[in-house]
Amino acid sequence: MPIANPAATAPYATRAEETRGRLFQEPESATRTAFQRDRDRIIHSGAFRRLKYKTQVFVYHEGDNYRTRLSHSLEVSQIARSVARVFGLDEDLSETLALAHDLGHTPFGHAGETALDSCMRDFGGFDHNAQTLRIVTKLEHRYARFDGLNLTWETLEGLVKHNGPVVTPGRSIADLPRAIAEYAETQDLELATYAGPEAQVAALADDIAYNNHDIDDGLRAGLFDIEDLMALPLVGDVFQRVMDRYPGLETTRVIHEAVRELIGTMIEDLLSETRSRLAEARPRSAADVRAMSRPLVGFTAEMTEHNAALKAFLFERMYRHYRVNRSMSKAQRIVRDLFSLLHGEPDQLAPEWQAGCDGPGGIKTARRVCDFIAGMTDKFAIEEHARLFDLHDPRA
């Protein structure tokens, strides 16, 4: 029988000892809960290790101090565990989902995803959440008896639904990314309901970490300065308070103090709003949380507006900055070049990636090439492009 997590004390917490199990049955551990085993499998996966060299905005060689997908995932997991602990949830499940949520991202961040989705337009498209599901259910080859990591139902559910129900009145299973729709035929993840509370915590921890650490990275890179932030609601107020509190403080310390305070403020808002929703809904189980008409975990309306203003600022001043655009344009060209060549000439793939292809230009070949490129790090994609296209590259 699965063992329990004694720290998950809330009646609405997901119970490790009551897990719906794994697709392939395995003996239970005598020392770890089901969700602790999921977390450990994620950490030991090849896809997780590669996050070290996958970036969100800046290509890997632009500086050692910018965040990678790996450092971001660790920051998300820290916030998620802290919030889950406050509410008596299963911290291990929240941590697992935080660590795994970016596994499906391409090299070069959203620019790489846009390029790969365009390449796959006639072959089912590309979606990073669906790719995460493919990785943990098919593409990791570490076990003798099954492909993937054989994670629990609760972890898979959280990975697919952390942003809310994916089947809605206006969206059927047929409209979903192919990987999710196909997996739904194998295992029912209850796609029309919300995810459990631990997944909801991980999703908002991602929002908190992403936005605030992009402020840090954008300021470090000189894409905007503190003065540009002063007109933003909440953000400008926090920076002003820090500068008033510590007159003459060096800029780097001002940034660290302000970002830390912003993260704390957003967490406090999340805690307050979620307590209010708990008092209203009074869920008695994780199933009650899934059946709610809105998320249990959330921000106040005011904080949601502040977040939207910050995202709009970052989109305009950071993600569309000409320096970022130049870098991302090059990155997209690399992805398109790699896909075009390898899809048309799959014999250029390593033998293990040729397996499952159906010839030049084939549908199965497209998905194999897509999986290959999506799993690349920024560094490997650049080097592979040079090997395939640069006649003077000694590695060709």
Curated annotation (Swiss-Prot):
Gene Ontology biological-process annotations: dGTP catabolic process
One Pfam family, short name: HD
Molecular function GO labels: dGTPase activity
Keyword Nucleotide-binding carried by entry: no
Domain HD, chain residue ranges per copy: 69-211
This protein's UniProt keywords: Hydrolase
PANTHER family reported for this sequence: DEOXYGUANOSINETRIPHOSPHATE TRIPHOSPHOHYDROLASE-LIKE PROTEIN, DEOXYNUCLEOSIDE TRIPHOSPHATE TRIPHOSPHOHYDROLASE
Family to which this protein belongs: Belongs to the dGTPase family. Type 2 subfamily.
Protein name: Deoxyguanosinetriphosphate triphosphohydrolase-like protein
Species whose genome carries this gene: Parvibaculum lavamentivorans (strain DS-1 / DSM 13023 / NCIMB 13966)
